[in-house]
Amino acid sequence: MASELFYSDSYCVFTFAATAHALKAEKVLKNLEADFLVIPTLREISTSCGLSVKFSPDNLDRYFTDLINNRVVVEGIYQVEKEGKKNRVKKLELS
């Protein structure tokens, strides 16, 4: 459920090169009834304006495959762990 995801201390995010790609990802994932949130891109990842999709690590493979199959261009995938007030961010390999 999105409310659980909102308060999660461990999650993944997809980043996109353009807002249009993020909006397309949102549309695709909504059509799949996926559990996700659209959030501002974390400063630890990028200082430019942008949107990211936040989701549970358990759904990484399925959501990534669905986005690729629907021709959504994903720029990066990151694992995020909250440590107090800071985020520990690890870039994951696109496959």
Positions of predicted regions on the chain:
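Terminal low-complexity, poorly structured segments
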Residues: 1, 47, 88-90
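N-terminal first-folded block
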Residues: 1-34
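Short, surface-exposed beta-edge/turn micro-motifs
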Residues: 9-12, 48-51, 75
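Amphipathic, hydrophobic secondary-structure cores in small proteins
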Residues: 19, 30-68
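Context-gated lysine
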Residues: 24-30, 54, 82-86, 90-91
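C-terminal structural segments of small proteins and small subunits
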Residues: 61-95
